[in-house]
């Protein structure tokens, strides 16, 4: 090949000179049988500059064994066929010659690489690093016609012919090893990353590929990805790169990513569009509080199917639902969209049982048709409540309750809720009929059972996993919702009899208490997770725990709890072993669940099961308080960690026992916890069922042989 200005090409050889006047060979010819060899050429120099021959001492002969896998490496390259000699000439522009066989090119600024069939010995001539022109090429496979070719690793696409300009790369679902090495090379050049960090970068890139994938129509905040990366580095004791370098790293792996600014006005954040967490990634359980703006990865309908009927008192509100979709409410709906990934939107709402009227005589003004109408209306009302909560639009609840419990009287004409598309209108009973129906004890008991089913479903939707990290904004929204429930319901039912109000408020109070407990448990779990991941803290806790005089603890607790000494010793040894193994929070949860199973196994199917479960909670709490007391007196360095762990384990034990009792009695956990609240209004009903499960007995009463 001659220089680029002459425009003539040689079919298979390239000869470069160190100056126009003389040729000084700087390397031995590269000889090989029919194989392709990629050799780095010297950088171009300004025209007219006096070029000096390169001195021989700077030339190095390098013999390498080439792996059989084909790789694409970034470099400024020359293509050489057969056994032709190669010389450098800094005065000439870089030129390429290619034949109809597939060839390799590449844009970037990186070191020299070559490829050849496995087992071949190739001698490469090298020199001091040359200047790399701005139009350097990247390694891509293409044919002479310029048609797109996908490389064997399935990593790239290229469009157009090789004309010395830049070419667009389109990334598919996987990145080849060459992509990772190219990203590291680019970061080393552009960011000045030292060579000893390049090995770490390779693991970071692989971590990206293991946890993220490309997907259309989804996005993640830039800060979300970087925070996940920082957590990864902290857990594996690695030195992270800065945010800017990490952004370049991501784009090197997931090529073609776009950046968008998403979110409500005044609270928008930059997002990467076209990337999401893999469904099986462990990061799905490690979402941080700062990630609450992450977009949902599956579409969920925001608009509730049911809305409170609009008042027609004024002309401005007549015939329009615009007040339900004012700008502030739309903003709240938009924000709630980002929390959908943390709740269970696939929950199936159970069916309600039919009211058991028995031989009860209905009032003259109440008929069986009215009872059936109440069943339909109340089911629809509960479905509307479920839809609103599932869309995290808590402010609609008050409107729904006001609409249902304050419908017009029958003398004022018909009234109804806007129904769904599948059901006819006429779902709201007149208020006088509703009051009369609620005065009937079987109807009130049926309504209370329906409330237990509804509120248990809402708990499982809002907090599907009490140990899974959720954003603090969602937790606070749930707690504010729980705080408002009793006031909203009392206000909506102000005209109803006191017994009806007490029954309804008793159930909703149990629902609110459950939400507060579960959100507190979730908060404790996230705080304890950091402690359990700290090796030094775990070692200190184990050292302090070994100094506790458990024999003295057993002597003091035995009179109160009357537990078997063998059971206590076994729990002590299991606890120390689990702590020594530096178990994760999920492993501790499994251990606690197994403890409950073993202790209550002997009472399974027995009427004494609720009492035994209650006694176990009391004894567990008493023993743990005795251990904390001993640690306090010894001024243990890990007292704070033990206190946090003790709070979490006590709360989680309560959660486990609550569900075991509900399972044993055939009730929902909401019903189990609501029985004490309903005692004042429904004491006779509860006595017929065998007494209140959670009425606490004297602490000195024994039984069960459980710790």
UniProtKB/Swiss-Prot annotation:
Return the GO cellular component terms, semicolon-separated.
cytoplasm; nucleus
Q: Which keywords does the record carry?
A: Cilium biogenesis/degradation, Cytoplasm, Differentiation, DNA-binding, Nucleus, Phosphoprotein, Spermatogenesis, Transcription, Transcription regulation
What spans are recorded as compositionally biased (Low complexity)?
Answer: 315-337
Q: Where is this region: Disordered?
A: 297-337
Give GO BP annotations, semicolon-separated. Answer: acrosome assembly; cilium assembly; regulation of transcription by RNA polymerase II; spermatid development
Q: Which family does it belong to?
A: Belongs to the RFX family.
Q: What name does this protein carry?
A: DNA-binding protein RFX2
Upper taxonomic lineage: Eukaryota, Metazoa, Chordata, Craniata, Vertebrata
């Amino acid at each position: 090949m001659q220089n680029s200005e002459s425009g003539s090409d040689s079919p298979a050889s390239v000869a470069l000179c160190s100056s126009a006047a003389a040729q000084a060979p700087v390397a031995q010819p590269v000889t090989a049988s029919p194989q392709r060899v990629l050799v780095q050429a010297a950088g171009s120099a300004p025209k007219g500059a006096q070029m000096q021959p390169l001195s021989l001492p700077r030339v190095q002969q390098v013999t390498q064994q080439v792996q059989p896998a084909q790789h694409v490496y970034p470099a400024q390259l020359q293509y050489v066929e057969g056994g032709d000699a190669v010389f450098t000439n800094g005065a000439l522009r870089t030129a390429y010659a290619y034949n109809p066989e597939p060839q390799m090119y590449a844009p970037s600024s990186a070191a020299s690489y070559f490829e050849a069939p496995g087992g071949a010995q190739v001698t490469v001539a090298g020199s001091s690093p040359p200047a790399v022109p701005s139009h350097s090429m990247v390694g891509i496979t293409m044919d002479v016609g310029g048609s797109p070719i996908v490389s064997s690793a399935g990593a790239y696409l290229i469009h157009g012919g090789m004309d010395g300009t830049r070419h667009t790369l389109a990334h598919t679902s996987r990145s080849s090893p060459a992509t990772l090495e190219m990203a590291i090379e680019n970061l080393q050049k552009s960011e000045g990353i030292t060579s000893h960090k390049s090995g770490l970068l390779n693991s970071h890139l692989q971590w990206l590929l293991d946890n993220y994938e490309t997907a259309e129509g989804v996005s993640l905040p830039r800060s979300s990805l970087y925070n996940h990366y920082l957590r990864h580095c902290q857990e594996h004791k690695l030195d992270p790169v800065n945010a800017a370098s990490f952004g370049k790293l991501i784009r090197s792996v997931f090529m073609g990513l776009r950046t968008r600014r998403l979110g409500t006005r005044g609270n928008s954040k930059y997002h990467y569009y076209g990337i999401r967490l893999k469904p099986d990634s462990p990061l799905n359980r490690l979402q941080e509080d700062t990630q609450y703006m992450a977009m949902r990865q599956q579409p969920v309908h925001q608009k509730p199917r049911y809305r409170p009927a609009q008042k027609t008192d004024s002309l401005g509100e007549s015939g329009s639902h615009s007040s339900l979709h004012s700008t502030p409410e739309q903003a709240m709906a938009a924000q709630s969209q980002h929390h959908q990934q943390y709740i269970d939107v696939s929950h199936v709402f159970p069916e309600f049982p039919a009211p058991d009227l028995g031989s009860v005589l209905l009032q003259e003004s109440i008929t069986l048709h009215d009872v059936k109408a109440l069943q339909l209306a109340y089911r629809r009302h509960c479905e509307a409540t479920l839809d609103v909560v599932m869309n995290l639009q808590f402010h609609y609840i008050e409107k729904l309750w006001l609409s249902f419990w304050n419908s017009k009287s029958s003398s004022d004409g018909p009234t109804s809720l806007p129904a769904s598309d599948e059901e006819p209108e006429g779902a709201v009973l007149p208020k006088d009929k509703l009051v009369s129906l609620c005065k009937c004890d079987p109807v009130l008991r049926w309504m209370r059972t329906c409330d237990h089913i509804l509120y248990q479903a809402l708990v499982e939707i809002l907090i599907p996993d009490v140990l899974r990290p959720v954003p603090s904004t969602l937790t606070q929204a749930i707690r504010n919702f729980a705080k408002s429930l009793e006031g909203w319901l009392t206000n909506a039912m102000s005209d109803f009899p006191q017994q009806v109000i007490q029954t309804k408020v008793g159930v909703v109070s149990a629902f609110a208490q459950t939400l507060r407990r579960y959100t507190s448990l979730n908060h404790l779990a996230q705080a304890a997770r950091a402690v359990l991941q700290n090796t030094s803290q775990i070692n200190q806790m184990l050292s302090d725990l070994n100094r506790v005089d458990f024999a003295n603890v057993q002597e003091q607790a035995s009179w109160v709890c009357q537990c078997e000494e063998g059971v206590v010793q076994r729990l002590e040894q299991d606890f120390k072993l689990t702590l020594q193994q530096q178990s994760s929070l999920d492993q501790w949860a499994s251990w606690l669940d197994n403890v409950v199973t073993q202790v209550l196994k002997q009472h399974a199917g027995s009427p004494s099961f609720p009492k035994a479960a209650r006694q176990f909670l009391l004894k567990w709490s008493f023993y743990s308080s005795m251990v904390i007391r001993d640690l306090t007196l010894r001024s243990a360095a890990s007292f704070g960690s033990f206190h946090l762990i003790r709070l979490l384990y006590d709360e989680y034990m309560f959660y486990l026992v609550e569900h075991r009792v509900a399972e044993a009695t055939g009730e929902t956990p909401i019903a189990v916890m609501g029985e004490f609240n309903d005692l004042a209004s429904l004491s006779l009903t509860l006595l017929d069922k065998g007494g209140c499960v959670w009425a606490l007995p004297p602490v000195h009463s024994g039984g069960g042989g459980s710790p």
